[in-house]
Every structure is written in structure tokens, then in C-alpha cells.
Swiss-Prot record:
All residue ranges annotated as the EngA-type G domain in the record: 3-166, 199-372
Designated gene of the protein: der
Protein's recorded name: GTPase Der
Positions bound to GTP 2: 205-212, 252-256, 317-320
Taxonomic classification: Bacteria, Pseudomonadati, Pseudomonadota, Gammaproteobacteria, Alteromonadales
InterPro entries: G_ENGA, GTP-bd, GTPase_Der, KH_dom-like, KH_dom-like_a/b, P-loop_NTPase, Small_GTP-bd
Native organism: Shewanella sp. (strain W3-18-1)
Residues in KH-like domain copies: 373-457
Biased composition (Basic residues): 473-488
Single biological process term from Gene Ontology: ribosome biogenesis
Keyword entries, A-Z: GTP-binding, Nucleotide-binding, Repeat, Ribosome biogenesis
GO MF annotations in UniProt: GTP binding; ribosome binding
Length: 488
């Protein structure tokens, strides 16, 4: 399970600065999907060998009243569901009453917490940070987030004990940067392994779109409502099921509910819980409310799924009972706002009455099969060559970019690794052209496809050829001639 790191602290202590620095390495993954809305409070990061979710909680002013206000509820929920809390303070401003109040709340929750004294650049850090020991939360870690000082060490301190306890293997940087080149036998074995496993299906969507109703309809039984009790809010509910001879695991992000102050049962919406479900799923089923159309929150959830590279199916729920004019307007909006994910199947359903629900699984299986289909190196290289024949790569400094061969780099999502010369100079427009070419050629449906480009090793790079004696004499004569012309 991917760990969650929550950034907690009063305003203006540098939470957003640290968040941006931690998540910067992941921005490129979203850049391939123009029109996508990014949520600046939640992100995926990779640093010091660990992949993790980082949350900028915000919204806590540190006062007792503020801690209890409704505005802080989402921030407090993020703290509850985080695995590690980084309590950020301002070393320049010193210890404040707000810091003391936040520390008191964190102590009461018994969360794994690390005190971070930020903005230590240009001051006597040891003296400035000494008073933060009085918070009673253990060692104080010094950091200058704006410059990146202390960030890597902090993540190592925070995540290593958690990872060891959970059995999470630490990855080397090279394992993330360089995709593996499968042999034909390894590719076939990996594809068979994935095909034999149950399909993990995460049902996600904003509150009240009908996730629970759809889950009950799929399972054919009414689920027992689960109320919040200690230990029940952390993870989604995993429900095994079998349909037409194929095994599934439904990841129910709507399984945990709570009572509001007026004793109404309302769905508890947790972005963190949704993020974890998406990370663990093979296929994501995004539910959209037909009566509300495509909301910004829908695009944010869609971004999580695309960021994780998951296969995707979209279901527009509550389709029954609305007139044709509204249906036409919704379809037009879907074409306009979701045109950048034309690879995903869209279904119009009624979870309450069961209309169209059966056809969802046809697209779910199709998406998973596309995401785990094995393609040989020779086939990928042939498609790559055909794309070059149809549209040549551009010239870079007078030399044309040369693509040599392609191979499988991974499954779910399917990753194609392309080797060549000057591939780092390829414009994004040509990369998108190649991605669409591979998608059409492979008939990939329901899953994003990722292209990774690797430079061919140049044996003469960073090497200078030693001149012969005659070449050295000619060089000296030429330099002497140039010098004489300048003096004249």
C-alpha cells in the first residue's frame, strides 16, 4: 500500500512550497492530457527511493476554535488517514500559540509525527529551532524547503521506519527512470500472471453520484451500512466476487459512512481513500451524475486515475427519468470536456434500476485485457518504423532524430520504451503523434498508453580524440597565423 504523508501547520510556514517541491517530479505525467484539472492539494511523489501520496492539508489556524470548526474538517480527516504527519513550523517566526494548539491536537491523535522547522536558511538554525523541542513531539528536523535543503533527509527519516514495518521495498532511482526490457519469455510470463489474477475494480466518484447503489446492484445484495468507529476510516472495503467465470475484487470507496450532527447518514468522501483505491486498482470506474454534468471534482478524480496509469471506464449514472434535451446537453458536454480521453468507453446507466449495468463489465474486461496484452518487440519496432515512414521525426540542429527500436516496458498501463538518438529533443507534438499511432495500431481501448524514450549510448561522448604529431603541428601553425593577423 502506498504511504500517505500529510503536511500540517499554520498558514505561511511553507507547506505549499514543500508540496510543490515533492510533487514536481510527477507533473510530467499529467502534462500529456491537456484540459485536465489538477488538484494542488493532493499529489503523487517519488523521492529518496519511495513513492508516496503527499497532502497539503491547509485550513488549520491552530486555535482551539479553529480546530473544531467545520472548515477544518477535511484537514483533520487528512491527518486521521495519513500514515506520516510532517508538522511544519516557521523557524524565523519562532514558536507561536497556534503551533502549541496544533501540537496538542496531534499528540491526542497519537499519529506518527515529525516536527519540521522550515526557513532555516540565513539564520542560526540550531538556536532558532531549540524552542520547538518543547512541543513534546520528539526531534526537530531543520529544512529550507524553498532551496530544497533537508528535504531528502526528512523524507528518509519519515518513511524508512514506516516502509520497513509495512514491508515496502525501497526502489532505486534507476528502477524508476529506466524501464525494464523484457525478454519474450519474461513478457509472456508477466502477461499470463496478470491475466490469472482477479481484476481489481475501484468505483470512484464525488459524493452522492450513486457509488453505493451501483456496488449493491453489482453484488446483488444490500450492503450493511458501516458507521465510523476507531480503526474503520483508514481503508476502502475489498469485496471479492465472480461474474461469468471471471474473478473480481470490488474496491468500495463509499463503504464507510458517518452520522452528521443532525443524525442523517451521509456519504463520507475522502480524497485520500480514493487515491489509495486508485493506486491499488487495475481498472477504475468513474461515476458521473447525469443531472449535474461534468464537475471540476470529476476532472480531479479523473486526473488521479490517469496519473496512476489505470485502465478507465466512465459511467454516467441517473440516466433514467431525464428528458431528451438534458441528455443531448450532457452528451455534448462529455464530448467537449472529456475529448482528451477518447480511449475510454462511456456508458449511460441507472444504478437504481439496473439499466446498462451489465454492459459495464464488457468494457471493464476489454480495458483490462488491453492494459495487459502482450506485444512482441518485433511488432512494436515495426509499428515505430511505420510511424516514422508516415511522418518523419523533426530535424534537431540539422540532424534528424533517429528512432532505433522499441520494446515493452511494463503493463497496466502498457509502456512502450523507444530507443534512439536525440530522442530527448523530440517535441511533445511528435510524442503525442506516436502515442496515438501506437494506440490505433495496437487497437488499445480503455487504458492510457505510455511512451518512454531512451537515448542510445554514444561511445564517443565526453571523449576527445588525441591529435597526431602532424595534426598538432598544423594546429600550432594555424593558431600562429590567426595571432599574426590580429596583431596587424
Amino acid at each position: 500500500m502506498i504511504p500517505v504523508v500529510a503536511l500540517v501547520g499554520r498558514p505561511n510556514v511553507g507547506k505549499s512550497t514543500l508540496f510543490n517541491r515533492l510533487t514536481r517530479t510527477r507533473d510530467a505525467l499529467v502534462a500529456d492530457f491537456p484540459g485536465l484539472t489538477r488538484d494542488r492539494k493532493y499529489g503523487r511523489a517519488f523521492l529518496s527511493g519511495y513513492e508516496f501520496i503527499v497532502v497539503d492539508t491547509g485550513g488549520i489556524d491552530g486555535t482551539e476554535e479553529g480546530i473544531e470548526t467545520k472548515m477544518a474538517e477535511q484537514s483533520l480527516a487528512a491527518i486521521e488517514e495519513a500514515d506520516v504527519v510532517l508538522f511544519m513550523t516557521d523557524a524565523r517566526a519562532g514558536l507561536t500559540a497556534a503551533d502549541l494548539s496544533i501540537a496538542q491536537h496531534l499528540r491526542s491523535r497519537e499519529k506518527t509525527t515529525f516536527v519540521v522547522a522550515n526557513k532555516v536558511d540565513g539564520i542560526d538554525a540550531d538556536s532558532a529551532c531549540a524552542e520547538f523541542w518543547s512541543l513534546g513531539l520528539g526531534e526537530v528536523y531543520q529544512m529550507a524547503a524553498s532551496q530544497g535543503r533537508g528535504v531528502t533527509n526528512m523524507i528518509e527519516y519519515a518513511l524508512t521506519p514506516y516502509a520497513e514495518a509495512m514491508g515496502i521495498e525501497r526502489q532505486g532511482e534507476e528502477e524508476v527512470v529506466d524501464e525494464r526490457q523484457y525478454t519474450e519469455e519474461e513478457a509472456e510470463a508477466e502477461q499470463k500472471r496478470l491475466q490469472d489474477l482477479p481484476i481489481k475494480l475501484a468505483i470512484i466518484g464525488k459524493p452522492n453520484v450513486g457509488k453505493s447503489t451501483l456496488t449493491n446492484r453489482i453484488l446483488g445484495e444490500e450492503r450493511v451500512v458501516v458507521y465510523d468507529e476507531p480503526g474503520t476510516t483508514r481503508d476502502s472495503i475489498y469485496i471479492p466476487m465472480e461474474r461469468e467465470g471471471r474473478e473480481y475484487v470490488i474496491i468500495d470507496t463509499a463503504g464507510v459512512r458517518r452520522r452528521s450532527k443532525v443524525h442523517q447518514v451521509i456519504e463520507k468522501f475522502s480524497v485520500i481513500k480514493t487515491l489509495k483505491a486508485v493506486e491499488d486498482a487495475n481498472v477504475v470506474l468513474l461515476i458521473i451524475d447525469a443531472r449535474e454534468g461534468v464537475a471540476e471534482q470529476d476532472l480531479g478524480l479523473l486526473g488521479f486515475a490517469l496519473n496512476a496509469g489505470r485502465a478507465l471506464v466512465i459511467a454516467v449514472n441517473k440516466w433514467d427519468g431525464i428528458d431528451q434535451g438534458i441528455k443531448d446537453r450532457v452528451k455534448s458536454e462529455l464530448d467537449r470536456r472529456l475529448g482528451f480521453i477518447d480511449f475510454a468507453r462511456i456508458h449511460f446507466i441507472s444504478a437504481l434500476h439496473g439499466t446498462g449495468v451489465g454492459h459495464l463489465f464488457e468494457s471493464i474486461e476489454e480495458a483490462y485485457d488491453s492494459a495487459t496484452r502482450r506485444v512482441s518487440t518485433s511488432m512494436l519496432t515495426r509499428i515505430m518504423q511505420m510511424s516514422q515512414d508516415d511522418h518523419q521525426p523533426p530535424l534537431v540542429n540539422g540532424r534528424r532524430v533517429k528512432l532505433k527500436y522499441a520494446h515493452v516496458g511494463g503493463y497496466n498501463p502498457p509502456i512502450v520504451v523507444i530507443h534512439g538518438n536525440q530522442v530527448s529533443r523530440l517535441p511533445d507534438s511528435y510524442k503525442r503523434y506516436m502515442m496515438n499511432y501506437f494506440r490505433r495500431s495496437l487497437k488499445v481501448v480503455g487504458t492510457p498508453i505510455q511512451l518512454r524514450f531512451q537515448e542510445g549510448d554514444n561511445p564517443f561522448e565526453n571523449k576527445t580524440e588525441k591529435l597526431t604529431m602532424s595534426q598538432e603541428r598544423r594546429r600550432k601553425r594555424a593558431l600562429s597565423h590567426i595571432k599574426d593577423r590580429k596583431t596587424k
